[in-house]
Swiss-Prot record:
Outcome of substituting residue 52 to A: 5-fold decrease in activity on Nav channels (probably Nav1.4/SCN4A) from rat diaphragm
Family that this chain belongs to: Belongs to the conotoxin M superfamily.
Entry comment describing in which tissues the protein is expressed: Expressed by the venom duct.
Keywords carried by this UniProt record: Amidation, Cleavage on pair of basic residues, Disulfide bond, Hydroxylation, Ion channel impairing toxin, Neurotoxin, Secreted, Signal, Toxin, Voltage-gated sodium channel impairing toxin
Domain commentary: The cysteine framework is III (CC-C-C-CC).
Organism name: Conus geographus (Geography cone)
Protein task: Mu-conotoxins block voltage-gated sodium channels (Nav). This toxin potently blocks rat Nav1.4/SCN4A (IC(50)= 19-110 nM). It also moderately blocks rNav1.1/SCN1A (Kd=260 nM), rNav1.2/SCN2A (IC(50)=2.7-17.8 uM), and mNav1.6/SCN8A (IC(50)=680 nM). The inhibition is reversible. In vivo, induces paralysis to an isolated skeletal muscle preparation from frog (cutaneous pectoralis) within a few minutes.
Residue ranges annotated as propeptide in the record: 21-51
Protein name stated in the entry: Mu-conotoxin GIIIA
Assigned GO CC terms: extracellular region
Xref: InterPro entries: Conotoxin_mu-typ
Miscellaneous: Negative results: does not or only weakly blocks rNav1.3/SCN3A, rNav1.5/SCN5A, rNav1.7/SCN9A (IC(50)=6.0 uM and >100 uM), and rNav1.8/SCN10A.
């Protein structure tokens, strides 16, 4: 009885992961072009500057998070 149960358990454990895993074509790692298109860039968000700790528009430069010496000096 125990050997039959062990065989059944082994079969179930071997079959379940094979059907539960996505196929190779469905994995986003295999589609770099689509992955790059989904990338969020600063061109889509005009209030975000690429420079770290910078804020726009200039009136926000008085915020504590903004670094005025780097961002607002030239404005």
């Amino acid at each position: 009885m125990m050997s039959k149960l062990g065989v059944l358990l082994t079969i179930c454990l071997l079959l379940f992961p094979l059907t539960a895993l996505p196929m190779d074509g469905d994995e986003p790692a295999n589609r770099p072009v689509e992955r790059m298109q989904d990338n969020i860039s600063s061109e889509q968000y005009p209030l975000f500057e690429k420079r770290r700790d910078c804020c726009t528009p200039p009136k926000k430069c008085k915020d504590r998070q903004c670094k005025p010496q780097r961002c607002c000096a030239g404005r």
